[in-house]
Each structure stands twice: as structure tokens, then as C-alpha cells.
């Protein structure tokens, strides 16, 4: 099966105009007929993203992992596609097998996106349904599939909660852990099961978030009790901006597999959250946002010129925003500092 032939109309709809993605995919998609050939193109594509939209990319901690073992990577979530794509790329280059990616069913509404997601070892977490029974069935199937993958010595990546952390607060949802445990809850306690899965915490951080303005507008509305209505193509637009727009320095820090003692899902989620927050590597924009919002300076290792550059960047982003939206913009950048300090 040629992926281009399977959805020719959708192919013409790819929203990566005036950039490399459309040109690159135009010449390469014809050769895709299996996961391996896609992942070779995926490698080249991620390298182009890094070379053309990222100033510096680092991934630390992979030496703690065994290339012969499978893991459950639980990550914070800032960008719809790049969080997992960049880590998968780093693993691939370090000699590890690439992982399977858990994605929400909201990304399956556009056919070409759905096809590409599935081909790149992605599977759906079905969170919606006509009845509670339908939802439970979908979550049970996802739980069973995660177990099946790990049992076959294949790794899995999943975000620590549903959706991106648009407010900049990285927290692990206990309900996510209960969903993962669902399939084996009668055989193993939750701590036993998660120790068996070998949970690895992951923190990804971006100097510049291409979707920061949209996130600020949404958070300002919801925090004021107003309804935020997502447009039909909003997720697709976010994917395109996240891939093509400048991101500055990008860091991924990978922790060692966690050991759990408690059988309380809240305590397990707190342990994962703390690990991810400790791993998070702040950038100059995080400190600049704190200065803009709090008029205080926290200790950091960046030069004065770098901080001023970041302040200018944030001010340019905030120019088009209302007072409440500006504060949400700054907040999404500095929250990581508050949380690392235990706030």
C-alpha cells in the first residue's frame, strides 16, 4: 500500500505550506509501504525539523536505559507531535527501538493525520463514546493493548494527562494510571503492575512555544469562566505551527525507571509528577516570563543579554493580547520554575 494513494485528497490538504514538509513529503511518500520505511523517512523529517526550526536539541539520560528492555515512557506534554517524535528520534539514534505512541481520539478526525499516526506505531486512547459503557470498553482495550505491547518487549509513550499542559503546569492524572492498570487490576496491585511496566519519567522543554499565544487566549477564557470553542482545524493548525515555527533550544531529560511502593494512585501520580518536574530543564524564556510577571529575578545561569533577548521575545508575543491573556502567556512560561521550587 502506498500511503499517498490511500488518501490522495487528504494529501493535497496537508497544511505545511511554504516550508520543507510539503516539498519533502511530495517526493518521499510514494515509497512508504510499511512501518520501517516510514520510520526512515520519519528520521530524515525530524532531522529537518531540528535543523530548520530548533537552535539546539539535547536529550540526556538515555544511557540509563537498556536497549534490550521495553519501558513505559510517561512524559509531560507541550506539543502535539514533537514531544514524542523528538524522543523517538533520540532513542532511534542511540540504538533503541522506537516506541508506540498513545494518542487521543481527537486527532483521528482528519483521515490523513489518522493514517500517518497509525503507520508511525500510534494507537488510540478512545476517551469519547455514546455511553459510559462505550467509554469504559475503549479504555479497557487501550489498557489491554499497552500490556500486550510491553509483554512483546515494545515500549510505549503516553502523556501524563489528557491534552497538552496549556497552562504550563505539568501534572500526572491519577485517572490515566487507573486506565493503564485496568486490564491487570485483578492480578496485580497498581504498584506491582507499574514496577513491571518499568515507568520512565520524561520532561521536554521548549525555549519558544509556537502555540503560546493560542494557549494563552484559551486559558484566559476558561479561567474567566467563559466558554472556549475549539475550531474544527485547531489541532491540525497547532501541529503545523509546532513543526514549522521556531522553537529555539529544546531539551529532553529522561529519568531512570521509577520504583513504586504505595498502592495509592494519587501517591503514584505525585511521584511521577515530582520526577518530571525535577527533570524539566528551564530556558531563558522561563526566567524572563517570571521577571515580566513578578518583577523579580530568580537565580539563573543565563547572561543578561540572553534574558533581555527573551524579554523582548515575550513582549513581542504579548503585544496582540489583552491584559488577562498576557498574564496567561507569562504564566505558561514561568510555571515550571514555580513547580520546580515546590510551589
Predicted feature descriptions by range:
Residues 162-163:
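Flexible glycine/proline-enriched surface loops and loop-helix/loop-strand junctions
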Amino acid at each position: 500500500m502506498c500511503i499517498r494513494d490511500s488518501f490522495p485528497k487528504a494529501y493535497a490538504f496537508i497544511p505545511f505550506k511554504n516550508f520543507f514538509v510539503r516539498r519533502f513529503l511530495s517526493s518521499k511518500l510514494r515509497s512508504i509501504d510499511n512501518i520501517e520505511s516510514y520510520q526512515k523517512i520519519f528520521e530524515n523529517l525530524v532531522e529537518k525539523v531540528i535543523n530548520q526550526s530548533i537552535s539546539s536539541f539535547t536529550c540526556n539520560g538515555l544511557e540509563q536505559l537498556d536497549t534490550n528492555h521495553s519501558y513505559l515512557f510517561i512524559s509531560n506534554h507541550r506539543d502535539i507531535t514533537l514531544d514524542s517524535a523528538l524522543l523517538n528520534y533520540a532513542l532511534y539514534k542511540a540504538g533503541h527501538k522506537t516506541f508506540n505512541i498513545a494518542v487521543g481520539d481527537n486527532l483521528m478526525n482528519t483521515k490523513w493525520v489518522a493514517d500517518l499516526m497509525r503507520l508511525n506505531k500510534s494507537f488510540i486512547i478512545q476517551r469519547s463514546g455514546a455511553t459510559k459503557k462505550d467509554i469504559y470498553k475503549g479504555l479497557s482495550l487501550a489498557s489491554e493493548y499497552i500490556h500486550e505491547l510491553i509483554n512483546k518487549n515494545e515500549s510505549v509513550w503516553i502523556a501524563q494527562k489528557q491534552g497538552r499542559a496549556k497552562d504550563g503546569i505539568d501534572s500526572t492524572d491519577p485517572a490515566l494510571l487507573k486506565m493503564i492498570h485496568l486490564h491487570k487490576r485483578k492480578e496485580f496491585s497498581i504498584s506491582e503492575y507499574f514496577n513491571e511496566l518499568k515507568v520512565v519519567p520524561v520532561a521536554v522543554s521548549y525555549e519558544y512555544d509556537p502555540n503560546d499565544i493560542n494557549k494563552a487566549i484559551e486559558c484566559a477564557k476558561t479561567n474567566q469562566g467563559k466558554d472556549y470553542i475549539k475550531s474544527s482545524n485547531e489541532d491540525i493548525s497547532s501541529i503545523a505551527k509546532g513543526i514549522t515555527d521556531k522553537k529555539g533550544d529544546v531539551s529532553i531529560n529522561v529519568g531512570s525507571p521509577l520504583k513504586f511502593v504505595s498502592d495509592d494512585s494519587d501517591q503514584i501520580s505525585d511521584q511521577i509528577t515530582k520526577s518530571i518536574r525535577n527533570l524539566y530543564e528551564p530556558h531563558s524564556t522561563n526566567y524572563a516570563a517570571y521577571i515580566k510577571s513578578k518583577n523579580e529575578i530568580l537565580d539563573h545561569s543565563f547572561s543578561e543579554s540572553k534574558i533581555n533577548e527573551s524579554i523582548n521575545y515575550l513582549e513581542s508575543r504579548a503585544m496582540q493580547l489583552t491584559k488577562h491573556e498576557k498574564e496567561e502567556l507569562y504564566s505558561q512560561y514561568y510555571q515550571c520554575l514555580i513547580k520546580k521550587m515546590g510551589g
